[in-house]
Amino acid sequence: MRSATGGHATRSHHSKWRKWPPEVREVISRVSGSHLPHLGRSSPPNREELSPTDREEIDRQKYRKGTRRAEKTVTNERRTRMIPYLCSCSILLYIIKMNLPTHIKLSMLPTLVLSATATKAAEQTTQARPNILYIMCDDHSMQTISAYGSPISRLAPTPHLDRLARRGMLFNSCFVENSLSTPSRACLMTGLYSHQNGQRQLGEGIDTTRVFFSELLQKAGYTTAVVGKWHMHCRPKGFDFYHILRGQGHYYNPVFCTTGQYGHYKEETGYATTLTTDHAIRFLEHRDKSKPFCLLVHHKAPHRNWMPEEKYMNLYADVEFPLPDTFWDDYATRGSAARTQKMRVDDDLRMIQDLKVPETLDATDAESLDSYYALMGEVNRFTPQQRLAFDRYYMPRNKRLLEAKLTGRELVKWKYQNYIRDYVAVIHSVDESVGRLLDYLEQHDLDKNTIVIYTSDQGFYMGEHGWFDKRFMYEESMHTPLIISFPGHIKEGSVCHQLVQNIDFAPTFLSLAGVKQPKEMPGRTIEPLFAGTTVKNWRKDLYYHYYDYPTYHLVRKHDGVRTERYKLIHFYGKGGDRAVQENKFQRMPGTSEYGTYQALKAIHYFRDDADVDYYELYDLQTDPNELHNIYGQKGTEAITRQLMKRLRQYRRELRVDE
């Protein structure tokens, strides 16, 4: 059926058209013919004649309903929204011409004006889908972002991350479901728990039959890209452009592979954080500007071994950072897992690889040699200028250390100070990168319709409990930073305290793009939290599961439940050699690309630990540092039953296979 103007119309609009006065039909025909070509023609418009917004909407409808139906639907939607507005305007002209008393004409005006205004307001709220800029670091702790107000960050501020927080929302209760790099990335891309996507441990490979959220965004009309650290043991899926590091990547002069050349890596001169940012901006400059974009910027930094950019190597050389309150923790009130880990600043932070003191090499010790080769793997990549900067800072510092002949707690304090100094110097470059990206958005008028997300793949220990690294379900590891800016949707300077998990990121991106969330995704969009008010039907607890034992750091397998106040953890599994014998050992990067079990055991990565099967319970309100395991204590029976029931429910509903 066609309208009087020659365009397609629904039956209801056609019948209404015939009832309108001739003068009204004449005005609509004249206006639509001169200003609205969609309404004044007998056939749908060519794609080239559509506005970018219309084209984006058609692309989305194509994905959902098919090409022919989509173009018809979008064209009719535009026509339907405009007809009431045009009618109001034309009827107003008709009334003015009518031979009626002035007071009657005036009494009719408010209704027409309100009708036209409401229609126009509704039209203005229909905005283009937002661009998505997702920035993720590797092992960035909340304690080193000054917006969170920790003692370390007060001495090493992050002004650009603070700027992002002022523009948007700071999330105080964001957590991961498995505090380990590759599993966390797999969770991001699939929106699934580790046991669901297949990437439970570092050495495993993700189930590539699982759909990545990037594939769904791409089909829905987004142009998609990822730059920096991928580390997923598979080809990037659903990306129009990628420029990614090989494996873990190097801080200096790293190798990248790019779109269409997966597996073919080329070295690029420079610092990884700067290069990754350069490639992100290059994508923004050359992208298809008729489409919204989703850009993932994944930094290697601040992953171990914390190599600062050459110009910032001595940035915090004279700063004395405070020791955490729990630095000298003896784990007396915890189970065996807290004592048998291998991630202590005093014993396990490597003097050569981590603290850059090659002068301490002991050629007769396997661990010392392994540490030396790991450091040289980075140093030998330096250009002459980079090597000069490295030697100028570290050689005098190391000389002072050796002359001081520190021992005991004084040596441990030296290790801590220099670990933190290198770590926050690496973060300084990350913060500058965030500033560059925010500046680009503002300079190119993209900031108003771009949601910017900053997070980390997990938290990290900055000396709490005497540790570095992550893995445990304890707060510093499970807890991860999250800052989101979305002008017009998130109030500036707002804070969210409700529980968020990284399984929520993929559903959020899909919701922002108007794409239906697949049923198998267990997370939920966090858009309702953007309003800044407490969402009553929000989740009350989270599930966590760490699988990667036995391997580096010897953190035992465990799962658990965290509520707003309590945390229940179950440590389980066979120890040491028995786990290896049952083929639970995953080959991991070592001194020769992939180490063997024997080589790793020689450098004390494995011990003949005992089998474990025990629980820990913490009241985070009265014991935020998790120093006192109250499992089994009198008065905790009710909360223990409640959490045990919830843990069993999670395992059953999620079909956890361990």
Model-derived regions, located:
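Intrinsically disordered, low-complexity proline-rich regions
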Residues: 6-9, 22-39, 43-47, 55-60
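Low-complexity, intrinsically disordered or signal/transmembrane-proximal segments
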Residues: 8, 13-14, 35-38, 61-63, ...
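Tryptophan (W) side chains
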Residues: 17-20
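Ser/Thr-rich, low-complexity intrinsically disordered segments
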Residues: 50, 64-81
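Cysteine-centered motifs
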Residues: 87-89
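Formylglycine-dependent sulfatase
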Residues: 99, 104-107, 113, 119-616, ...
